[in-house]
Protein backbone atom coordinates (compact mmCIF):
# COMPACT_ATOMS: atom_id res chain seq x y z
CA UNK A 1 0.00 0.00 0.00
CA UNK A 2 1.05 3.54 -0.75
CA UNK A 3 0.40 6.14 1.97
CA UNK A 4 0.28 9.90 1.62
CA UNK A 5 0.18 12.49 4.39
CA UNK A 6 -0.62 16.11 3.74
CA UNK A 7 -0.59 18.96 6.24
CA UNK A 8 -2.30 22.12 5.07
CA UNK A 9 -1.81 25.48 6.73
CA UNK A 10 -4.82 27.62 5.92
CA UNK A 11 -5.60 31.28 5.81
CA UNK A 12 -7.70 31.12 8.97
CA UNK A 13 -10.28 33.50 7.52
CA UNK A 14 -10.86 30.92 4.75
CA UNK A 15 -11.22 27.82 6.95
CA UNK A 16 -15.02 27.73 6.82
CA UNK A 17 -14.93 27.88 3.02
CA UNK A 18 -12.13 25.31 2.78
CA UNK A 19 -13.59 22.53 4.95
CA UNK A 20 -16.71 21.68 2.88
CA UNK A 21 -14.55 21.55 -0.25
CA UNK A 22 -12.03 19.31 1.51
CA UNK A 23 -14.72 16.95 2.79
CA UNK A 24 -16.28 16.71 -0.68
CA UNK A 25 -12.86 15.95 -2.20
CA UNK A 26 -12.28 13.21 0.38
CA UNK A 27 -15.70 11.65 -0.23
CA UNK A 28 -15.29 11.71 -4.01
CA UNK A 29 -11.82 10.20 -3.69
CA UNK A 30 -13.14 7.29 -1.61
CA UNK A 31 -16.25 6.76 -3.77
CA UNK A 32 -14.95 7.39 -7.30
CA UNK A 33 -11.34 6.17 -7.24
CA UNK A 34 -10.96 2.38 -7.17
CA UNK A 35 -7.33 2.66 -5.98
CA UNK A 36 -8.14 4.91 -3.00
CA UNK A 37 -8.60 2.76 0.12
CA UNK A 38 -8.70 5.41 2.84
CA UNK A 39 -8.91 9.19 2.99
CA UNK A 40 -8.98 10.64 6.50
CA UNK A 41 -9.38 14.36 7.18
CA UNK A 42 -8.14 15.42 10.63
CA UNK A 43 -8.20 18.72 12.51
CA UNK A 44 -6.84 19.95 15.84
CA UNK A 45 -8.88 22.41 17.91
CA UNK A 46 -5.66 23.95 19.25
CA UNK A 47 -4.42 24.66 15.71
CA UNK A 48 -7.50 25.72 13.73
CA UNK A 49 -5.40 26.78 10.75
CA UNK A 50 -4.18 23.21 10.19
CA UNK A 51 -5.78 20.28 8.37
CA UNK A 52 -4.04 16.91 8.22
CA UNK A 53 -4.81 14.18 5.67
CA UNK A 54 -3.94 10.48 5.80
CA UNK A 55 -4.57 8.70 2.51
CA UNK A 56 -4.01 5.08 1.45
CA UNK A 57 -3.80 3.95 -2.17
CA UNK A 58 -3.13 0.62 -3.83
CA UNK A 59 0.11 2.00 -5.26
CA UNK A 60 1.80 5.18 -6.49
CA UNK A 61 -0.05 4.94 -9.81
CA UNK A 62 -3.38 5.12 -7.95
CA UNK A 63 -2.19 8.28 -6.21
CA UNK A 64 -1.14 9.74 -9.56
CA UNK A 65 -4.64 8.94 -10.85
CA UNK A 66 -6.06 10.80 -7.83
CA UNK A 67 -4.01 13.88 -8.71
CA UNK A 68 -5.36 13.76 -12.27
CA UNK A 69 -9.01 13.19 -11.26
CA UNK A 70 -11.39 15.99 -12.27
CA UNK A 71 -12.75 16.34 -8.73
CA UNK A 72 -9.24 16.77 -7.30
CA UNK A 73 -8.26 19.30 -9.96
CA UNK A 74 -11.43 21.29 -9.21
CA UNK A 75 -10.68 21.15 -5.46
CA UNK A 76 -7.08 22.29 -5.97
CA UNK A 77 -8.17 25.23 -8.13
CA UNK A 78 -10.98 26.26 -5.77
CA UNK A 79 -8.77 26.20 -2.66
CA UNK A 80 -5.51 27.59 -4.07
CA UNK A 81 -5.92 31.00 -2.42
CA UNK A 82 -7.11 29.48 0.88
CA UNK A 83 -3.91 27.51 1.51
CA UNK A 84 -0.79 29.32 2.74
CA UNK A 85 1.32 26.19 3.20
CA UNK A 86 1.29 22.50 2.34
CA UNK A 87 3.60 19.62 3.24
CA UNK A 88 3.01 16.41 1.28
CA UNK A 89 4.90 13.22 2.11
CA UNK A 90 4.77 9.85 0.39
CA UNK A 91 5.20 6.62 2.36
CA UNK A 92 5.24 2.89 1.74
CA UNK A 93 3.02 1.14 4.29
CA UNK A 94 4.77 -1.87 5.82
CA UNK A 95 2.13 -3.01 8.34
CA UNK A 96 -1.53 -2.24 9.01
Predicted regions and their residues:
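Short amphipathic alpha-helical segments
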Residues: 14-37
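Generic structural signal for individual residues within well-ordered alpha-helical segments
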Residues: 16-19, 64, 73
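Short, flexible helix/strand-to-coil boundary loops that buttress conserved ligand/catalytic motifs
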Residues: 22, 66-67, 76-79
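Generic structural signal for secondary-structure transition and capping sites
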Residues: 27, 34, 62, 72, ...
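Glycine-rich beta-strand-turn "strand-cap" elements at beta-sheet edges
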Residues: 40-49, 74-96
Amino acid sequence: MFAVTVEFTLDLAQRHAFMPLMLENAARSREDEPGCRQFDVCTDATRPDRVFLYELYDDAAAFDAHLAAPHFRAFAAATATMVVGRVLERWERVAP
